[in-house]
């Protein structure tokens, strides 16, 4: 059963206070890919995130939204999934604790919420236009069948040269993600550009110029190790970000004062040594008289 609440959710004081798993190396790569797209006006399109949790990566991604574009986030937010994904229930806004947390977190950094589709990611292809997205972050279910469906939707929604990021690509507890992504490389013409310790980045467009520019940028980064291997007939850039220095984080719209710590009680006054010794002597003396 989903957990609902009407109580206000306190906003985070800063980006580091938003719960989630979005490591510095991937923040750097999101920043690099999205800023690169700004250099090519013809690479217009919307932003899409499948799976949001409490919004850490969505907050980051939303900062690259350009005028006239739309940012869509699709997540169940702990609401029950109906048997019929096309039912009217899919458009209901369940006030779950997770969704309220996402909204409070996102609005702490942005004036407006993204378009929220509170539904299984299997519906997203029916909600957006084909070839409409320039950047897609797939971070929803870890089950192979679901990830495979998310990849199919991403391929349909991705515009020319769109970048697609896949989370938990190398996590030992998520073999279905790796299987689905490599399956897409083998059978769906997905071209991987690079991988980090957690994510894979690819495109259905021309990967070669992106890969070449990324390699030049990586040469300038002393905090990122990288190597290139031939995998499935194409170069794949491996990136180690253990020492990565994250880019400047998104800044809250309105500074939030950290919660005040409750005042500590004053320590009790110490008992004078002489008085305590006298009390002990009287107690012992009374015992002897008995």
Ranges and model annotations:
Residues 2-20, 34-289:
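S-adenosylmethionine/decaboxylated-SAM
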